[in-house]
Amino acid sequence: MPLTIRQALREDIPHLCHLMKELSGHEISQEEMNNRLEFIEDSPFDSLYVCEENGAILGLLGFRIRENLEEVSKYGEISVIVVDSGARRKGVGRFLMNYAEKLAFEKGCIGTWLVSGFGREEQAHPFYKELGYEITGYRFVKRF
């Protein structure tokens, strides 16, 4: 059966928590994930999608529309992308990235971008480069 993408639902929360733990290495409670889904549902700019095959959730895509004031344009931000460790190297990540690019194009964006942290140079970064993404800068963070 082919891969499909749909909006994330409340009943997906246990799977979403699992995928986010695979991405970050940290547990996220179902309550916290529910809060994040509520935020996304209330936002006109944010969306959360799951990728399925035969009803099994294999991946997660967070997508956000970002206004770029410097260029007076919009970009589609891939705010989260994660594929279940048991489904990697099977086209799920590429399918999700293609979907994000299609969404961005349909919403009048001039491109897509994402942030990928240190420690992902072996797998994620070559994958993004293969898809045509370029490293264009650094992200600076100050935690409170």
Please state what every model-predicted region is.
Residues 73-85, 138:
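Conserved acetyl-CoA binding element of GNAT-fold acetyltransferases
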Residues 104-116:
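Conserved GNAT acetyl-CoA-binding A-motif
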Residues 9, 66, 84, 88, ...:
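Residue-level recognition of the GNAT/N-acetyltransferase active site
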Residues 94, 118-137:
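Conserved active-site alpha-helix within GNAT-family acetyltransferase domains
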Residues 7-11, 18-73, 79, 143:
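Acetyl-CoA-dependent GNAT
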